Amino acid sequence: MTKKTNFANTFFASSIHNAIDKIMVELELIRRLANQHSGEKGREAEGILNGFLKTMLPNKWTVDTGFIINENNVSPQVDIIIHNQLEAPPIYSGYSHVIVPIHTVGCAFEVKMQLNSHLAYLKCQENAKIIKDMHTSSVNKKQQPLYIVFVYSANVDLGNLEIKLNNSEHRHIDCICIIEKGLIFLNSHKSKYFSFHASSLNEVNKKTILGYTIKEKHMVMIEFYAYLMHALQNIKTEVPDYHSWKDESLTELLNI
């Protein structure tokens, strides 16, 4: 009996395969053309992921770069912010940056071209804590926005990094995606990190019915995208309390 093809699964995997191939081609161009300008490489790296997310996420979610604000604080610059503009538009929208209320944020990304130090990943925990604390102090919803560290290349062992993260007292990063190695996820109880090694999967280096060969980076991106879509489905954003903001802002502006 001929095996029936699941077209949804086939085209889903093929779409991610094409997207990651496009990303890798663009990355190689960046490495060649911007070899002497690390700042430019970083911005281009953010732009590549930004483009992928804008193409692959539902229209409910808007993808921007900028700052997150609540009643009392403004975050440091966030590389990529996924926010629900249907709930509330940005408080400020400039040529390249926005300021969005924490109430509408679904995910914040820290994007790195390369990240090799365990200490650097632990530093990312501090950045994630800022966003999580802003949400806790301002939003009624229990489910916090995601914080993801997305890395294109890293000279670290995924297993050792998992151990370092679990030995730390911090549990603020939800996911670390390293395209060339795999992923590290925070479990649903927010108590422990566990790693996903693409090299351990049977599908790697096998040829598909569509003619292309599945590489480790394809499996990493398929897992990352599936995780992101599922997690965003469970995040409930809300409209900020504009009446309260109005009263407090007028009080401060008029120095009452």
Features from the language model and the residues they span:
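Intrinsically disordered, low-complexity Ser/Thr/Pro/Gly-rich regulatory segments
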Residues: 1-77, 82-256
